[in-house]
Regions:
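A short, polar/charged loop-to-alpha-helix boundary motif
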Residues: 40-48, 338-351
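Short, surface-exposed loop or secondary-structure junction motifs
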Residues: 29, 90-303
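Short glycine-rich, acidic/polar surface loops and turns
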Residues: 306-308, 313-321
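Short Pro/Gly-enriched beta-strand edge/turn motifs at strand-loop
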Residues: 3-6, 299-306
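Short, conserved catalytic-motif segment at the N-terminal edge
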Residues: 1-54, 75-78
C-alpha cells in the first residue's frame, strides 16, 4: 500500500494531521491496517487508540432505526409525532422518520446545547422548535448536523425502552465485536480509557491547537450523530457487515433487503442548502455521486463506484463501502484543517487506496 502511505505522509508533512489510522478490507478480509504519526507530541499513534468519528457516527443511528423497522416497532413513513407527540407543533407536524434520515426535515438551525444540556432538555428544545421558513418536508434538503439525530435517538428510546447509547452498544457494537466502539461512552469507561482517547487538533494555518472534543462531557454525553469513538478497524467492520447483507461472521444485524433499502438512492439530484451543492442520500448514508456535480463536493471517494455508500465526519474522518469492489474503508485523522485542504487530503488518500488495490 505504498501510494496510501505516501498520501497520508504528505498530509502529515503539510501539517494537516499529526497522526491517524487507516483500515481497508477487500472481500471481507483485512488487507491494510496501520497507524501513523503521533497521538500526542512524542507519543506514537497505535491501532489501539480510540479516535472520534464525528458525523461518521450517523449511519449507526440509521441501522438502529432499521432494526426497529424490521421488528415492526416503527415505519419509515411514520410521522415523528406518532412516536414523540410533543414534536408535532410549529410546522413540524408532517415530518416523517424518512425525512430525518434523508436530511429533508427542516430543523437545521436549532442550537441544542450539547454537551452541557442533558438529553431530556435537548429533546424538549427540539420539540419546541419551529420548522425553517419556506421549507417543505421531504422536498427541501439541507444537511442536519445534530438536531434530527437526537430525535432519531429519542425514537429508538421510546420504541425500545433503552437509551440510544445502550441500544447501539448492545444491538450493534457488541454483536459485531466492536468492543472499543461507543456513542456516548459510560463515565467509568471514559476514566479507564482516558489515555487511549486521541485528541483532535485544529490544524488550520498556524500552530496546531488541541480541541476539547475528548473532554469527559463530549465523550460521555450521547450525541447520536456526532460523538462516536473507536478504532478505524471497528468502524470498517461496521461496513463489512453491510457489504455482506447485514451479517458478520454468522451474526445477523439486518436483513439483506433492509441493507438494500438503507443504501439505495432515496434523494437524488436535490440541492443541499447546507453544503450548497447537489448531494445524493440513502437513509442515513451519503451515496456516491450519480453525476460529476455530486462527486465533486462533499463526497471524499472519487475513485469509488456510484454505488458506494458511507459518511464522513468534521474535517477528520470518512468511512464507506463500495459494493462493486467489495471494499470497506475507514480513515480517522487527528487534524482538522480548512475545508479545501481536508477535501484534497481525503480524496488523495482514498484515491491512493484504490490505486494500491488496482482499481484506479
Amino acid at each position: 500500500m505504498r501510494q496510501t502511505k505516501r498520501a497520508f505522509l504528505e498530509g502529515l508533512s503539510a501539517g494537516l494531521q499529526s497522526g491517524g489510522q487507516i483500515y481497508v478490507s477487500e472481500n471481507g478480509r483485512p488487507v491494510f491496517e496501520e497507524a501513523f504519526g503521533e497521538v500526542r507530541p512524542s507519543e506514537s499513534m497505535t491501532t489501539g487508540h480510540l479516535l472520534p468519528w464525528m458525523s461518521s457516527s450517523k449511519p449507526v443511528a440509521a441501522v438502529a432505526i432499521a432494526q426497529l423497522w424490521e421488528r415492526g416497532l416503527l415505519a419509515l413513513d411514520d410521522r415523528v409525532a406518532d412516536h414523540i407527540p410533543e414534536f408535532g407543533t410549529r410546522g413540524k407536524e408532517s415530518i416523517t422518520i424518512r425525512h430525518l434520515l434523508t436530511h429533508t426535515g427542516g430543523l437545521r438551525m436549532l442550537d441544542v446545547g450539547w454537551p452541557k444540556a442533558p438529553w431530556e432538555e435537548i429533546i424538549a428544545k427540539i420539540c419546541h422548535g419551529r420548522l425553517e421558513p419556506r421549507w417543505v418536508p421531504g422536498q427541501t434538503a439541507g444537511y442536519h448536523r445534530t438536531t434530527s439525530w437526537f430525535i432519531l435517538g429519542e425514537i429508538v428510546h421510546r420504541a425500545d425502552g433503552r437509551s440510544f447509547d445502550q441500544y447501539v452498544r448492545q444491538e450493534v457494537f457488541e454483536p459485531l465485536e466492536m468492543r472499543d466502539s461507543w456513542i456516548g461512552m459510560p463515565v467509568e469507561t471514559f476514566t479507564q480509557n482516558a489515555e487511549r482517547l486521541a485528541p483532535l487538533f485544529d490544524t488550520q494555518p498556524g500552530v496546531p491547537v488541541e480541541l476539547n472534543w475528548s473532554s469527559e462531557k463530549r465523550v460521555t454525553r450521547c450525541s447520536p450523530g456526532a460523538n462516536g469513538w473507536g478504532p478505524a478497524r471497528e468502524l470498517g467492520r461496521f461496513y463489512e457487515m453491510l457489504l455482506t447483507g447485514g451479517t458478520w461472521q454468522g451474526v445477523q444485524i439486518l436483513l439483506p433487503q433492509t441493507v438494500e433499502a438503507l443504501t439505495a438512492r432515496h434523494r437524488s439530484g436535490i440541492f443541499d442548502k447546507t453544503f450548497r451543492q447537489i448531494l445524493d442520500w440513502g437513509l442515513g448514508f451519503v451515496i456516491n455521486g450519480s453525476n460529476e456535480d455530486s462527486r465533486s463536493g462533499y463526497g471524499h471517494w472519487p475513485s469509488a463506484s456510484a454505488r458506494a455508500f458511507g459518511h464522513s465526519g468534521y474535517r477528520s474522518s470518512t468511512a464507506f463501502a463500495d459494493p462493486e469492489r467489495d471494499v470497506a474503508i475507514a480513515i480517522l485523522l487527528n487534524g482538522t484543517p480548512d475545508e479545501n485542504s481536508h477535501l484534497r487530503r481525503m480524496r488523495a488518500i482514498t484515491t491512493a487506496i484504490y490505486q494500491d488495490l488496482g482499481y484506479a
